[in-house]
Amino acid sequence: MAEITVETRVSAPRQSLVTLTHVLYAMHAFSALMGLLTPAFIVTSFLAGWPSIIAVIVNLIKRDDVRGTYLESHFSWQLRTFGYALLWLVVMFLVLVTLGIPLTLVTLFVGLPIAVVFAIGLGIWVLYRIARGWLALIEGKPIRVPS
């Protein structure tokens, strides 16, 4: 059977945009790592930290500038990391609130530990996504983002 290949044209990005993408990964990483150094969880520090929020705003503003380059995949990767982390944190909060009404021993000994484990797992996932994306950027490669 013949193999079908699809070749897409990707233009080389300007160096300033590559540098900007490194800065955005650094901002996300800084916010996430603050969760290790403070009483906050990694994921809450990542989502509520000013550097991460500013990085997301810049991602949205500069999205058109990177369209058609391999940096487009990195911008999508960063936005999806933030968006999915926020979504899962909201889901976790809703589950905890649902289990927590009324406040019982079950909530304290079952719901809260589940939420803590979930928040730690989500934080590890955020760190993984930042590291994987940044390493691909260092190599000058796009990130595979499902459509």
Name these PLM-found stretches.
Residues 1-19, 141-147:
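Low-complexity, intrinsically disordered extramembrane tails and loops of integral membrane proteins
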Residues 5-6, 39, 43-45, 138-142:
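Conserved catalytic or regulatory cores that recognize and/or transform ribose-phosphate-containing ligands
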Residues 18-56, 79-127:
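Hydrophobic alpha-helical transmembrane segments in multi-pass membrane proteins
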Residues 53-65, 128-131:
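Membrane-water interface of transmembrane alpha-helices
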Residues 61-65, 99, 103-107, 134-142:
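Membrane-interfacial segments
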Residues 63-82, 137-145:
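Amphipathic, cytosolic membrane-interfacial segments at TM-TM junctions
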Residues 124-147:
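Cytosolic juxtamembrane helix at the C-terminal end of the final transmembrane segment
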